């Protein structure tokens, strides 16, 4: 999954990033990942362009791309995603597999 957070200058990289929907329900965070994968490569990668995100080794072909809307209050490592993108993620059949493997890249400003 690629989280496009461009335009959200307040987003800061974190060891334990979280993605929530507009109602605050977590759609990606520590509860979704394998401890082994997180220790090996971190919960997510960070980059500055969509092009580099698409070619990152942790991302497979045809990644789900979601757009970050804002950060959650003062928690600048918690990105709020739209409810419609969150629904797409929850409906993806491989949803738990790629999240468990920390196959997430966050594109920053």
Where are the regions a protein language model picked out?
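Domain-level marker for long, solvent-exposed, non-transmembrane regions
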Residues: 1-109
């Amino acid at each position: 999954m690629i989280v496009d957070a461009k335009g959200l200058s307040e987003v800061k990289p974190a060891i334990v990033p979280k993605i929530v929907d507009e109602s605050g329900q977590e759609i990606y965070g520590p509860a979704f990942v394998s401890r082994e994968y997180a220790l090996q490569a971190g919960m997510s990668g960070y980059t500055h362009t969509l092009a580099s995100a698409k070619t990152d080794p942790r991302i497979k072909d045809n990644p789900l791309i979601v757009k970050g809307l804002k950060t959650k209050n003062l928690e600048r490592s918690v990105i709020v995603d739209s409810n419609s993108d969150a629904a797409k993620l929850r409906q993806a059949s491989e949803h738990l597999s790629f999240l468990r493997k920390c196959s997430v890249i966050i594109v920053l400003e």
